[in-house]
């Protein structure tokens, strides 16, 4: 169990204190259900559809399976650290980088989470408009329609944020949303799988790419999705009953969902008419309206996950506001931003911003993952070594992406920061790991 400094206790900063045993209620099934649900999304399918023209079906499948297993494994490893230490993501950043310097990655995380929450609201709004036009002849693309649909989804998200996170995960996601989204994925797989079989599996499997991307670059793109969840997974995993179930449940749940949704994107682009967007292709499938509606409904938990974690991180900086109050403010702000920001144009920026969290968590895992009981938030204001390793990792990531894309950027950066962070870990951590 992690230790915390007295100032956090006195100010009631729940984001920097280890979670109480009373709130450790998630078992294996809750971890698996949550991260399967969060692994499902239209953006994942869109990236899967993007891979095929670049690398071909066979290499896309390899990149999807390996990238998902590695990315989900990294998520699961971080989940175990969060569960064993009882700390939030912000708490882990404070313990690793120092109380003053940690504010920088915490702020970057808040910016990322606000961006992703806004993006999810746009996805749900646009999906609702597509369903309305395709199925009912309603034109919701005007400003009035945009305001109405965005406000409806924002209102649903506010209601979820106002409720208990523990209840939302255990009852709404685990018992209600998960079975419905699995049913929709099974139906879409059956529909598009049947079309592929009718056209011939060999032609589908041997489709070549145009060479615009290599296998490792494709894996980086796949890994980018689970990596985008790294800065918030501890906010949920710390409520687990034990680290092993948090790790295995997260790994299996997220990897399965990620592979499935990427594969669906590959299947859709392989049978759809050229130029048809993903949402339209899904709607044109038999039963696609219901299936897409269920997937859109599932998008709300992605937005919830981002907004709740953004609230936890914000509370860590300004604890005078509760996590619930921060959550409501973030949702309202994101609902307004969804009306004005060109979120589809900002999507590459959000993925790029996610790249800074590969070295960030390489350092965190290198410092603490081998003995989470040594984690504490009584660090100095700046851990110069950890900060330097993170910055060096960011530089390495972008150098690799630009000048050696054939080797990928995520895995070399993760290995570099992890090894150096482990070698330079504090003496207290060395002593505990030696016991």
Question: What label would you give each PLM region?
Answer:
Residues 1-58, 208-218, 238-245, 425-435:
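Membrane-interface "cap" regions at the ends of multi-pass membrane proteins
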Residues 18, 361-423, 427-435:
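C-terminal membrane-solvent junction of multi-pass transporters and transport-like membrane proteins
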Residues 28-44, 189-196, 205-268, 283-304, ...:
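Hydrophobic, membrane-embedded alpha-helices of multi-pass small-molecule transporters
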Residues 54, 80, 104, 130, ...:
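Membrane-water interface regions at transmembrane-helix termini and the short interhelical loops
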Residues 64-96, 107-112, 118-121, 425-431:
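Juxtamembrane transmembrane-helix boundary signature
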Residues 121, 125-129, 161, 179-205, ...:
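Hydrophobic alpha-helical segments and their helix-loop junctions in multi-pass secondary transporters
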Residues 134-164, 179-187, 214-230, 255-256, ...:
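Transmembrane alpha-helical segments of multi-pass small-molecule transport proteins
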Residues 149-192, 247-254, 350-362, 410-418:
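Membrane-interface loop-to-helix entry segments
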């Amino acid at each position: 169990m992690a230790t915390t400094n007295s100032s956090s206790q006195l100010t009631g900063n729940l984001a920097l204190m280890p979670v109480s045993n009373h709130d450790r209620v998630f078992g294996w099934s809750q971890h698996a259900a949550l991260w399967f649900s969060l692994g499902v999304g239209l953006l994942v399918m869109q990236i899967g559809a993007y891979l095929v023209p670049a690398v071909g079906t066979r290499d896309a499948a390899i990149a999807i399976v390996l990238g998902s297993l590695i990315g989900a494994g990294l998520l699961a490893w971080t989940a175990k650290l969060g569960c064993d230490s009882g700390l939030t993501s912000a708490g882990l950043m404070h313990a690793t980088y120092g109380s003053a310097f940690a504010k920088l990655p915490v702020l970057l995380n808040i910016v990322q989470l606000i961006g992703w929450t806004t993006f999810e609201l746009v996805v749900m709004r646009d999906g609702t408009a597509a369903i309305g036009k395709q199925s009912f002849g309603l034109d919701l693309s005007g400003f009035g329609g945009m305001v109405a649909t965005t406000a409806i989804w924002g209102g649903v998200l506010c209601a979820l944020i106002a409720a208990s996170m523990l209840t939302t995960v255990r009852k709404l996601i685990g018992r209600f949303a998960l079975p419905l989204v699995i049913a929709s994925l099974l139906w879409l797989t059956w529909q598009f799988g049947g079309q592929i079989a009718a056209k011939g599996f060999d032609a589908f499997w041997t489709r070549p790419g145009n060479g615009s991307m290599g296998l490792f670059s494709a894996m980086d793109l796949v890994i980018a999705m689970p990596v985008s969840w790294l800065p918030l997974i501890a906010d949920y995993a710390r409520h687990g009953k034990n680290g092993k179930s948090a790790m295995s449940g997260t790994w299996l749940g997220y990897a399965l969902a990620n592979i499935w949704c990427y594969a669906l994107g590959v299947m859709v682009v392989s049978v759809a008419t050229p130029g048809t967007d993903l949402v339209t292709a899904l709607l044109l499938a038999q039963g696609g309206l219901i299936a897409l509606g269920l997937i859109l409904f599932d998008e709300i938990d992605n937005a919830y996950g981002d907004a709740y974690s953004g609230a936890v991180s914000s509370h860590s900086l300004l604890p005078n506001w509760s996590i619930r109050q921060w959550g409501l403010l973030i949702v309202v702000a994101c609902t307004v931003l969804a009306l004005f920001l060109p979120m589809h144009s900002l999507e590459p920026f959000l993925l790029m911003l996610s790249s800074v969290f590969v070295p960030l968590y390489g350092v965190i895992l290198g410092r603490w993952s081998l003995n989470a009981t040594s984690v504490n938030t009584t660090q100095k204001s700046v851990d110069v070594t950890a900060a330097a390793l993170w910055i060096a990792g960011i530089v390495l990531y972008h150098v690799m992406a630009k000048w050696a894309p054939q080797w990928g950027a995520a895995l070399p950066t993760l290995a570099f920061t992890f090894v150096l962070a482990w070698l330079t870990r504090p003496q207290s951590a060395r002593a505990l790991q030696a016991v």
